[in-house]
Amino acid sequence: MPLPFYEFRREIVTKKILSFALLLALLCGAWGAYAEETGFQTPTVLDASNLAGVPTHYLLYDREFYEAPCDQPGTVVKMKYNTNMYGEKTYKKTMYVYLPYGYDENGTDRYPVIYFFHGRGCDPTTLLCNPETKNAFDHMISTGVAKPFILVAPTYYYDARHLLYDWEQFPREMREEIKPLVESTYRTYAETADEAGFRASRDHRAICGFSMGSMTTWALFPHMLDVSASFLPFSGPMQDTEAMIAAVEKSEEPFYIYMACGGAEDLAFENCNALAQTLAADPHFSYGPSREENNFFYCLSDNIHQDLTSRYYLYNAFLDGLFQ
């Protein structure tokens, strides 16, 4: 049973606040030196631990630098496919794929992959067809914040026109249609686009989403834990805690959940804070930013509730060790 809030703060926060302060100092110092070399500003640091109820940190990049065009641009391509997972009718679907600068279809390099799910009322174009977001991804890679990565933006709607979805069936579409199509077309770390290949490459695959896409990420956790080690739910609560805990107890595979949310103007703020405090106090989870020592972290910002803030959260996730 989760600890009461005041006990939780006494037990968790007091033990870790000094290490977090040291981490922030190191981050600021390292980025200060890096900024002098590259000519762009040190990220703005926000410590919202008092609002989150757990130690947290959030860094905002220099938008003037990151959101301007990059001289090493990646590309965004469209993929079309049919799904047969929803009754007798076949549905036509579209997803978008970000490929990093230098991706060569005839090359041999392999890349980690992120599957990103949009929020309600948005679609697969929302993130990747936004120029500032693509520029930011390009700069994250060119500056070394992130290793070159592939990002895939599908949709959980099987009928986008009528906003129809089925979370019971969508995990099958993800495992049997989306993932095999993407990873047989583009060179991820899956050397074979089958269950064996996906399990062997799970450390290089992440499931991510914003708002309703975050809820999709939580819903996929029990069904994707064997083939993905990283889950990044942004500004969206969990619907089925019992299924998640059961999956954690059943699996012996390590995992890391990097949860993020905006501030008081983010409509998911209160629910995400409550969830973060509950999970951080649960014995199934070890709270903190170290992927070697922990399996859950909460990045709290002062952003509004908007899909495009996902690029800021991914920036923080990369700084905190995603795919490193």
Task: Name each region found by the language model.
Residues 7-21:
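Positively charged n-region of N-terminal signal peptides that target proteins for export
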Residues 21-29:
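Bacterial N-terminal signal peptides
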Residues 28-37:
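Sec-dependent signal peptide cleavage junction
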Residues 36-324:
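Non-catalytic cap/lid and distal C-terminal segments of serine-dependent acyl enzymes
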